[in-house]
Amino acid sequence: MSADAAAGEPLPRLCCLEKGPNGYGFHLHGEKGKVGQFIRLVEPGSPAEKSGLLAGDRLVEVNGENVEKETHQQVVSRIRAALNAVRLLVVDPETDERLKKLGVSIREELLRPQEKSEQAEPPAAADTHEAGDQNEAEKSHLRELRPRLCTMKKGPNGYGFNLHSDKSKPGQFIRAVDPDSPAEASGLRAQDRIVEVNGVCMEGKQHGDVVSAIKGGGDEAKLLVVDKETDEFFKKCKVIPSQEHLDGPLPEPFSNGEIQKESSREALVEPASESPRPALARSASSDTSEELNSQDSPKRQVSTEPSSTSSSSSDPILDLNISLAVAKERAHQKRSSKRAPQMDWSKKNELFSNL
């Protein structure tokens, strides 16, 4: 940035617009008693709003051509002739007045020294500062993402803003702010979302509730609002903005995905380690897990087969993983165990003699 700009010298603004489906999204008009064409209204979410164009700006140049003395129709024709993109040099009322007092002719060249000074830094120097300034830039960016408290007193025409709700997202939003209104003077902007009205949280409230809260404040209203970027930041932090965040510490976004993954893995492991198993079941499960990584596991299963067949037959893991030979052997043992034990002949004779 140039020294003059850093010292606070007023400068015009260059707004570059690309035509959208609904045009550029601003209204141009002339004012009685004033020379030139002025921006009357900037539609929310339009290319004009994204370019930085503001209601009340005076149009100085269109694509580098001065239009200060042209008629309304001539200016409109120039903008339409630009087809799908246009470059507008504008000044806000305050800057316009200061430049006139200084006797400075407003033109696009006023911005070029600033651009050259920004590009004059050699790449090596830029690389040197880049790593060191990155964290500071991020911190500065976080400091900017704060709610704003807009305090306004009702004027002859009210506060000078329109409130609306959006079906696609919850909350009450500022649709438009009238030029030179109490709302504009308070810093209220189009697309701001209302968080508090006169210190009362409006989260989850309906349109009628918010309107009633504003009217309930009498001739003064204090609106805590957030712009779109700040709103998204606080939602990532899972925190509702409040007046404490106007100058207090800001929350930090967090991600617990990895923590949840770790805890879920522990949840799967812990029951297996805590639930008591017989020695037979433990040996079987170890053999089964090794089977996925080794071709020798069947040999280990045969060698580690226990002598007790009644408990092994109740374990489904063993039944699913035994070899054919082991299965035949168990079936043979099972049939043998069902046969009646042989009777001692001496007892047999004794039994018959008793009958």
Curated annotation (Swiss-Prot):
Keyword Kinase: no
GO annotation (BP), single: establishment of epithelial cell apical/basal polarity
InterPro entries given in the database record: EBP50_C (IPR015098), NHER (IPR051067), NHERF-1/NHERF-2 (IPR017300), PDZ (IPR001478), PDZ_sf (IPR036034)
PROSITE patterns on file: PDZ
Signal sequence range: none
Gene Ontology MF: a single term: growth factor receptor binding
Pfam family, one: PDZ
Subcellular location: Cytoplasm; Apical cell membrane; Cell projection, Filopodium; Cell projection, Ruffle
Comp. bias regions, Low complexity: 270-286, 303-323
Positions of modified residues (N-acetylserine): S2
Topology relative to the membrane: Peripheral membrane protein
Function, as annotated: Scaffold protein that connects plasma membrane proteins with members of the ezrin/moesin/radixin family and thereby helps to link them to the actin cytoskeleton and to regulate their surface expression. Necessary for recycling of internalized ADRB2. Was first known to play a role in the regulation of the activity and subcellular location of SLC9A3. Necessary for cAMP-mediated phosphorylation and inhibition of SLC9A3. May enhance Wnt signaling. May participate in HTR4 targeting to microvilli. Involved in the regulation of phosphate reabsorption in the renal proximal tubules.
Protein name (database record): Na(+)/H(+) exchange regulatory cofactor NHE-RF1
Originating organism: Mus musculus
Gene: Nherf1
